[in-house]
Amino acid sequence: IHSVYFVGIKGVAMTSLALYFYSKGVRVSGSDVKDRFPTDEMLSKFHISVLEGFTPAHIDTLKNVDLLIYTGAHDGKNNPEVVRALSLGIPVLPHGKALGFCMEDSKQISVAGSHGKTTTSAMIATVLSHAGKFPSYAVGCGEIFPLGSPGACGTGELFVAEAD
C-alpha cells in the first residue's frame, strides 16, 4: 500500500490510524468537516492534507490511491466519497476492519471497556516504547505526549490498539 485516503480523518481513531500509515511511509490524505477537532494540530504537524467536506470530486482528483478507509460517522458506507471510490474500483474498508488488517501480523494488545481505554492504551504504548519493545500503536486521542503521536508503526512485534 502506497497511498491511503481517510473519509472523516479528523476523528481521533481515524487520525491515529492515519499516523500509523504515515509512519510506514505511506502517502496519507483525507477529508472531514470544517469544524475544529483536537486532531487538527497533529495532522498539520505531519503535513497531512485534509480536504473540506465530502464530495465525489475529491475522489476524482486523487492519484493512485490504494485504499480508502471510512468512519461510521458522516453516513459511513453511504458517504458520497465512499460511494464514488467503490464505483471507481478503489478498495474500501471501515475503520475497524482496517485496524484489524494492520494488526493481523502482530502480537495484539487491544484495550476495551467503558472507561479508561484511551489512558490505558496510551500508557501501555508508552511503557512498551520506553522498554525498548518498539510497538506499533493506534490510540484514539489527540496526542500521546511522551511518544509525540497517537499512532505509529513500530519495528517490534506488538501492536497496541484502543478497541471501540
How would you label these PLM feature ranges?
Residues Y20, I59-T61, G76-D164:
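Phosphate-binding loop of NTP-binding sites
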Residues I1-A98:
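N-terminal leader/targeting and accessory segments in enzymes
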